[in-house]
Amino acid sequence: MRSQMPKDSTVMFDGTSFFTRMDDSLSAKGYNPKRSLNPQVRLLYVFGTPVHKPLFYRVLQGSVVDKTAFIDTFKAIGCTDCIVLADKGFYSKPNISVLQNSGLNIKFIFPLQSNTKLVPASFYENLDNSKFDGVFTFNKRTIFFKKFKVGNDGNFVYTYLDESRRCDDMTHFVEKAENNYDEEQFSPMDVTKQHRQGYFSFISNLDISPKEIYLKYKQRWDIEECFDYLKNAVSTNPMYAHNNEYLSGLAFLNHISLLYYFGLINALNQSEYHNDFTPSDLIKMTRNIEKVTYDDQTMVCQIPKKIQEVLTAIGVDVLRKI
């Protein structure tokens, strides 16, 4: 897999947990965003942004922390221009220090918790949008942004306000207050005190425009979609792996599945149907297409016209001779 690594382009690191019941060395309790105490294994992936596909993976013991695995993997693949993306649970000053003192040119973009102290409370309480550095649009959504320099290590905090997200958060808060869904007692008008709704922030050692940071991290959301695909759609589940060799085989099959899934994402994004269907939609649409045999004749069952049009648009020919 190392031969697939681009030498002068950016790649991204990300990891996910798979819970397993196997009694073997790779299965161990460790950190995961769900804070589950079940034994797990960690799957660390390297993704290429220009080619937009998974390039490299490692199966790790569940107790191995990502910061150590990131550094070891950097050395293993010989990466010279890499960006680490992680979830909200990863950021801490010790983790940042480990990456920055590794002696490697590691760049990172980490999301911050909504209650982070790196953004002053007064910033949220100020309701005047002139406090922002600027604004851009993404998918017909208005995104305001502010960039802060923090500390003396060349790190920056990028803070955003998504007005559409803010409206959704406010609606959700009021609905919970009206129906007493929360353990704490709130009145609907307490929504006026929730100054952080619609805000989200990242910390990064990249000194670039806030829009670039936003777009780079959005690629992780595409990766999350693929991890969801692995966990929910691919039947090779590590839950019932009996030993490390069996688990390694499952990881390889998952990798092959992920390559096809990313190929589907790329083909769909380049077609006229990229706003109409998701990769999961296409998989559901085509799962009943079968090859049937009558006597000595083999044929593909009838395909609905709309599905055939979509398949043709993304370059899939299910009627080809193999």
Describe each region flagged by the PLM.
Residues M1-I322:
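Anion-binding and metal-coordination hotspots
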